[in-house]
């Protein structure tokens, strides 16, 4: 179920503060965050945000197409290792 339109988009305050500080100084350092639930805003475009996937921080370069989506959509939390081998096929 989608978020109510009257509430507006959500982003953690600490993340927005870091982005605003970088925009004021003009630097392009990587922002490390655990906030996968935050919505990407237009002021985040052209920044690199390292999003936590449960094990490590994965860098995500934010483009204009990503605005309105969540940060967690661009970093997978599960890795597919493949299905188990069939014993009958491996014996032959």
UniProtKB/Swiss-Prot annotation:
User: Among its keywords, does the record have rRNA-binding?
Assistant: yes
* MF-aspect GO terms: rRNA binding; structural constituent of ribosome
Keywords from UniProt, A to Z, are: Ribonucleoprotein, Ribosomal protein, RNA-binding, rRNA-binding
Give the GO terms filed under biological process for this record. Answer: ribosomal small subunit assembly; translation
Check the record and name the Gene3D superfamilies matching this protein.
Answer: 30s Ribosomal Protein S19, Chain A (3.30.860.10)
Give one Pfam hit by family name: Ribosomal_S19
On the tree of life, the source organism's domain of life is: Bacteria
GO CC terms for this protein? cytoplasm; small ribosomal subunit
Please tell me whether the keyword Metal-binding is annotated for this protein: no
* Chain's role: Protein S19 forms a complex with S13 that binds strongly to the 16S ribosomal RNA.
- Family statement drawn from the similarity comment of this UniProt entry: Belongs to the universal ribosomal protein uS19 family.
NCBIfam families under this entry?
Answer: rpsS_bact
Q: Can you name this protein? A: Small ribosomal subunit protein uS19
Q: Which organism is it from?
A: Lachnoclostridium phytofermentans (strain ATCC 700394 / DSM 18823 / ISDg)
């Amino acid at each position: 179920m989608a978020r109510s339109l009257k509430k507006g988009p959500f982003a953690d305050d600490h993340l927005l503060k870091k982005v605003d500080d970088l925009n004021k100084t003009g630097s392009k350092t990587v922002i490390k965050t655990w906030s996968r639930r935050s919505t990407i805003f237009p002021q985040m475009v052209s920044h690199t945000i390292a999003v936590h996937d449960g094990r490590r921080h994965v860098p995500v370069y934010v483009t204009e197409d990503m605005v309105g989506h969540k940060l967690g959509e661009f970093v997978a939390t599960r890795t597919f290792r493949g299905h188990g081998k069939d014993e009958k096929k491996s014996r032959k």
